[in-house]
């Protein structure tokens, strides 16, 4: 792996690994090696959820559990993590197998999001909880400053359903049109058909649920509700 690219990534992250092998593992997809990043991803997912929950708890002392849960879900969901990954140009640093490289895996939202979680797990093992917590808060500063409780934090499928019901329109239909990849690393493509839109809207994700949420989010944007 190009050391110039790796050093540039660490500068963008705001953290230099003491044990570079942890960084290498965090950037390695299971298609590239048996020493891949899925265990780090598991760890990072839990750490991220805790750090964001703790930040929201202290930022919003009068907000109830439901609104805090929805805000946390917005901040830790796959497309938010993928946005962060793109801000760090993470795609150019990924270690992917030939099949994933050929299919453009370095652009795939689910792979970018999973790698961000693996990096969080790697930083924790390389340092301590205080260091990784401060790093996450630095990454999320703008998003934490901008987020607020309310209906906008409901997931896209719920918001779309409520919008249509409020106008006495039929509920959206979701159809799986493609499933790519091996069982452990699939990508679902969903078509969402909504009354008033001439063509179905496409969403993709690492599970059917995530793909449906992505499609609903695109519908909301077309309806100018996002």
UniProtKB/Swiss-Prot annotation:
Identification of the protein by name: Ribonuclease 3
Family per similarity comment: Belongs to the ribonuclease III family.
Essential cofactor(s): Mg(2+)
Record's subcellular location: Cytoplasm
Domain RNase III: 6-128
UniProt-listed CDD domains: DSRM_RNAse_III_family (cd10845), RIBOc (cd00593)
Any one biological process term the GO annotation gives: regulation of gene expression
EC class: hydrolase
Function of the molecule: Digests double-stranded RNA. Involved in the processing of primary rRNA transcript to yield the immediate precursors to the large and small rRNAs (23S and 16S). Processes some mRNAs, and tRNAs when they are encoded in the rRNA operon. Processes pre-crRNA and tracrRNA of type II CRISPR loci if present in the organism.
Organism of this sequence: Salmonella choleraesuis (strain SC-B67)
Subunit structure: Homodimer.
Gene of this entry: rnc
Chief site of localization: cytoplasm
